Every structure is written in C-alpha cells, then in structure tokens.
C-alpha cells in the first residue's frame, strides 16, 4: 500500500503515456488508409455493352417469303435488320424479267412478310409495307398492311378517307397491332359495311 502511494504519480504518468501513444498510432494508421473506390464503368465498357446488345438483336432470325421474278422463289431465313436486296441475293438474284424499279431494295425486312418482285410490264400497284415487305396478291394489286401503313397508304384504300385513316393510326398507337383484319371494325367510323368494302385490300402481315 505504501509502495502504491509512493509510486502513484509514476503509474498515472505511465498509463497516460500509454493511452496517448495508442491514440497517436490509431490516428496515424487511419490517415494511411485509402478510401475504398467504387468501380465506375468507363465509356469504353459502356460502348462494348451496347454493341453486344445490338449484336444480340441483329442475330435474331426472321422468316420471309420471296416471290415473283427471282431465280429461286421460296421461304428463307434472314436476320433482323436485313434488307430487301439481301433477300433477293439469297434467292439467287433477280431474273431477266424483273422490274427492280418498282422495288425498294433498301427496305428493312420484317418477320413473316412477303417480298414480291414484279416482272417488266406487269401491271401491279405494288406498295411498300412499312416493315420491309413488298406485298402482292397475284397481280390484282398490293395488299395494304394496316399495322405498318402510313397515312397516305391507308388513304389509298378504296373507301378510306383522311378521317378514317387517322382513326386507324390512332387506334394502332393506342392499342397496338391488329391481330386480324376483322379487328379494324373496332376503329371508330369503320363498321361492317365499310369492312366488306376494304377487306380484300388489307392485311395484318
């Protein structure tokens, strides 16, 4: 007990020194630690990811039916983004009778569409569908795809004026694609009588 009293100050000083030393070591160690940096994707990495996504989309297979003045008419598998010119090439090219002036070779193909290459002198009102199809009903005139047709193309249908054409596009934008040609009767202003007049001129594919 006497020893503790005699050395009390020394013990307190030693303890204080130890605590002070520990604090200094802790502070020094904390300063040397670098903050953890979160990995941020670089612009190059983002570009690579976008390119891979685009490649996946372009690798999707579609099926088209090419008819008319080509070497090998038939059903062919194509890739998303392919154009009419590529479909013609896959069918062996056009025949000597082909009238390419009536065909939009740069048009993009859609799955399930018909590409028709007319012959020279053939009287067909060939119309280019918005999705890359060149559709024809055997020389009697082209069918208008009501899912892709523009305002002008819709007005080209006998019995469809500007107001009905606008109504068709408005319905399409609000409700999506027409599943059957009969669905057009759901459009305001187009009843059964109107449908009977236009059904032979329209398609949904």
UniProtKB/Swiss-Prot annotation:
Record bears the keyword Transmembrane: yes
Inducers of expression: Expression activated by ComK.
Membrane-spanning intervals of the chain: 10-28
Residues in compartment: Extracellular: 29-205
GO CC annotations, alphabetized: plasma membrane; type II protein secretion system complex
HhH domain mapped to chain residues: 142-171, 172-201
The UniProt record lists the keyword Cell membrane: yes
Listed GO MF terms: DNA binding
Keywords: Cell membrane, Competence, Membrane, Repeat, Transmembrane, Transmembrane helix
GO biological process entries: DNA repair; establishment of competence for transformation; protein secretion by the type II secretion system
Main location: membrane
Short name of any one Pfam family annotated for the protein: SLBB
Protein location: Cell membrane
SUPFAM superfamilies, per the entry: RuvA domain 2-like
Cytoplasmic domain ranges by topology: 1-9
InterPro entries noted in UniProt: Competence_ComE (IPR004787), Competence_ComEA_HhH (IPR004509), Endo/Exo/Phosphatase_dom_1 (IPR051675), Hlx-hairpin-Hlx_DNA-bd_motif (IPR003583), RuvA_2-like (IPR010994), Soluble_ligand-bd (IPR019554)
Membrane topology, record value: Single-pass type II membrane protein
PANTHER family (alphabetical): ENDONUCLEASE/EXONUCLEASE/PHOSPHATASE FAMILY DOMAIN-CONTAINING PROTEIN 1, ENDONUCLEASE_EXONUCLEASE_PHOSPHATASE FAMILY DOMAIN-CONTAINING PROTEIN 1
Main function: Needed for both DNA binding and transport. It is absolutely required for the uptake of transforming DNA but not for binding. Its role in binding may be indirect.
Protein name: ComE operon protein 1
Source organism of the structure: Bacillus subtilis (strain 168)
């Amino acid at each position: 007990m006497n020893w503790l009293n005699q050395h009390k100050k020394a013990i307190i000083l030693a303890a204080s020194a130890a605590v002070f030393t520990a604090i200094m070591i802790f502070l020094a160690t904390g300063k040397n630690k670098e903050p953890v940096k979160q990995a941020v994707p670089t612009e190059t990495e983002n570009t690579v990811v976008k390119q891979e996504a685009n490649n996946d989309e372009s690798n999707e297979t579609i099926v088209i039916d090419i008819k008319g003045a080509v070497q090998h008419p038939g059903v062919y598998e194509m890739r998303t983004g392919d154009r009419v010119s590529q479909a013609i090439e896959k069918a062996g090219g056009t025949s000597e009778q082909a009238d390419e002036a009536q065909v939009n070779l740069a048009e993009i193909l859609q799955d399930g569409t018909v590409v028709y290459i007319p012959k020279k002198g053939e009287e067909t009102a060939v119309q280019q569908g918005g999705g890359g199809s060149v559709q024809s009903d055997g020389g009697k005139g082209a069918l208008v795809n009501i899912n892709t047709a523009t305002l002008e193309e819709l007005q080209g249908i006998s019995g469809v004026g500007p107001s009905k054409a606008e109504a068709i596009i408005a319905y399409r934008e609000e409700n999506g694609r027409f599943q059957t040609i009969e669905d057009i009767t759901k459009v305001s202003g187009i009843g059964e009588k109107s449908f009977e007049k236009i059904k032979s001129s329209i398609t949904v594919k």
